[in-house]
C-alpha cells in the first residue's frame, strides 16, 4: 500500500515581514502569540527542507510550501506511534520536553485558521483530504484529532479500480481549487490504498500592479549556453531594496494587499549556491531590517513554475527516518494494519502576473530626460530565488529557486 501526500499549491499572483505591523484587527496578545510560537521551528524546518531539495536537484527549479508540509507532517504524527511520533515532531524542530504535544497541535490549529481566514483581499483555499480504500476504516482517535486540529476530510474510494479512484480524487481537487489544478493523478495502475492530500490555493493581489502595457518578451538566461524567451513584467517606483554586503545578491521586497510579503533575490552570477547556503531565519530578519526604500527599475518574469518531489528520502536524510519504514509505526491511523508506506509527494504550482490593487502610473523603459535620481535596475533575467511569507503569522508560505522558465 502506498501513502501518498500531495500538497497542491497554486497561483501566486501577489504584502514588511516579521518586523511589520500585522493588518489583522485582532489585538488579543495571548491569541496573537499562539500561532507565532510555531514560527521559529517552522522557518528553520523550511530552510532545512529547501536546502535538501535544492541539493537533490542541481540546476533545476525548486518550489514548495514549507508551512503546508509542516502542517501535514504534524497531522501525520497523530497517527504515529512511539518513536516515530517523536521523530516526526523532533524533525519539525519541537522539543517535547519543553512543548507539550497537545500545545503543538493547538498552535497548528490556530495557524491553519488564521491562514485560511485572515486575508479578505485574497482568494485562499486550504485543506486536507484523506482518501482511503473502502476496506479500511479510520481509528476514531485519528479521525477526531485530525479533523479537529487540521480540518481533515476523509473520503472512501475504490482503489481496486484505480482509474475510477484517480478520477474521483482529481474531481475533488479540481472543485476545491476552483479548477486551478486538474489531472493531479494519471489513470495508471497504482498499489495505493490510502492517499493523503494537503492542498492550498492562493491568488493574491500586488499592492502595486505591474502595468500590463510594459510587459514584453525578453531573454531569460538559464545558464551560459541556454536562453529562453519569457514575458517580462516591468515597473519603476520606490520599493524596498538591498544590495547585500554579506551575501552576494540584490533583493527587492514586494507586498500583497493582505498579510503576505514576497522577496525576490538575484544572486551574483555563479553565486546561487552561496546565497542559498546563507539562507536562514537570521538572514530573513537581517534583510527585513536592512531593506530601504529606493527608486528601482524592476523586471520580473510573468511565468508559471511547478515542482513535484518524493520527500521520503529527503525527510530520511533530515532525521525522520521511520516515516517510510514500517507499517506499525503508523498503527494509529486505521483499524486495519497498514502495509509499508512508500511515498510522500509534494506538488507545487506558481504563477506571477501583473494584477495589483493600486494601478501603477504608466512607466517607460529607459531614462527620463528630466533630472532625477538614477534608479537601481534589478533585472530577473537569470536564475533567482523567490520567498513568500505571511508576516502576521511569520509563516514561510513558499520558497522557490527559479532556474529554467521553459
UniProtKB/Swiss-Prot annotation:
Gene Ontology molecular functions: serine-type endopeptidase inhibitor activity; steroid binding
Do you know which InterPro entries this protein is assigned to? Serpin_CS, Serpin_dom, Serpin_fam, Serpin_sf, Serpin_sf_1, Serpin_sf_2
Cellular component GO terms, alphabetically?
A: extracellular space
The cross-references to SMART domains, in alphabetical order and at most eight, read: SERPIN
Q: Where is the signal peptide?
A: 1-22
Location in the cell: Secreted
SUPFAM superfamilies on file = Serpins
Q: Which UniProt keywords apply?
A: Glycoprotein, Lipid-binding, Secreted, Signal, Steroid-binding, Transport
Name any one Pfam family assigned in the record: Serpin
- Positions that bind cortisol: 253, 285, 394
Keyword Secreted annotated: yes
Q: Which residues are glycosylated?
A: 95, 119, 223, 259
Site (Conserved cysteine within steroid binding domain) location in chain: 249
Look up the domain of life of the source: Eukaryota
PANTHER family, sorted? CORTICOSTEROID-BINDING GLOBULIN (PTHR11461:SF34), SERINE PROTEASE INHIBITOR, SERPIN (PTHR11461)
Give a short account of what the protein does.
Major transport protein for glucocorticoids and progestins in the blood of almost all vertebrate species.
The domain section of the record reads: Proteolytic cleavage leads to an important conformation change. This reduces the affinity for steroids.
Family, similarity comment: Belongs to the serpin family.
- Descriptive protein name: Corticosteroid-binding globulin
Which species is listed as the source?
Answer: Sus scrofa
Source lineage: Eukaryota, Metazoa, Chordata, Craniata, Vertebrata
